[in-house]
Amino acid sequence: MKLLKVAAIAAIVFSGSALAGVVPQYGGGGGNHGGGGNNSGPNSELNIYQYGGGNSALALQADARNSDLTITQHGGGNGADVGQGSDDSSIDLTQRGFGNSATLDQWNGKDSHMTVKQFGGGNGAAVDQTASNSTVNVTQVGFGNNATAHQY
């Protein structure tokens, strides 16, 4: 299983135009770590899917005009740290389960979008966006959720 994870992460660490990367992870409480690495360049796509408790994801897209970054986490204890510097790009984060947290940053962009959806107790989101004509949507359903959003 360790070799499979390393191969999946290695396949996504390099970057360039019109590249797509996917890091699926399954397993309960195994402490999986999805390193999306730096998938940069225009028209890039980065997807991380995690199923099981104890997972974490770190994703960065820089100089990624017209690009998409998607993280989906199901299970307790998940966390995500996401960054994107781009125009006309999007971040879509979905977390289902207990104890999830997310930090999202989008900078130097215009016409960009961030969507955060959290379902379950104890979720938290911190969102910062430095972008013109851009949008942030945060949806939280459950107990003890909190959100902080800044747009500059």
Swiss-Prot record:
One GO cellular component term noted in the UniProt record for this chain: pilus
Location relative to the cell: Fimbrium
Domain of life: Bacteria
Keywords: Fimbrium, Signal
Single GO biological process annotation from the record: cell adhesion
Signal sequence coordinates: 1-20
Function: Curlin is the structural subunit of the curli. Curli are coiled surface structures that assemble preferentially at growth temperatures below 37 degrees Celsius. Curli can bind to fibronectin.
Similarity comment text for this entry: Belongs to the CsgA/CsgB family.
Protein name: Major curlin subunit
Organism: Escherichia coli O157:H7
This protein's encoding gene: csgA
